Amino acid sequence: MIIANGMLGVLPTSLLFSVIREKYSYCYSIYSSFKIYDGIIKIATSCNKENIEKIKELINEQIDIIRNNKFDDNLLNDTKNMYISNYRLADDSISNIMWSNYRESVVNDQRTTDKIIEDFMKVTRDDVARVMNKLVLKVDFELI
């Protein structure tokens, strides 16, 4: 789900950012975040209220693009490469060391950075589509 979420809305190459923010200029910012141990994806945007319905429609379209395996190979490859670079760069940071200790002690995740990178490299188009097909809208919240 990490790669799928990256493709959806984490990175500057993501569908939400490149389509809704850059192509249509419907919002000031838009992103998705994945709560890894809760299995929750949150999508947030800052926009004018007259664009809310258009944005919701476009969000669903971007999710469907991933669900239906209609995305460009470059999006998948760029996303994997960006995450791999970020993991390598952060490997020696204090916050990453603390995160690794948390994963190991609290959730019994013993994977090393190299193993996580190896797992990222194995992610396929079908893997991404499959996990996005499990996505279910639970809450739709607007703060105006």
Name every feature range the model reports, one short phrase each.
Residues 1-41, 46-144:
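Mature, solvent-exposed C-terminal subdomains and processed small-chain segments of exported/organellar
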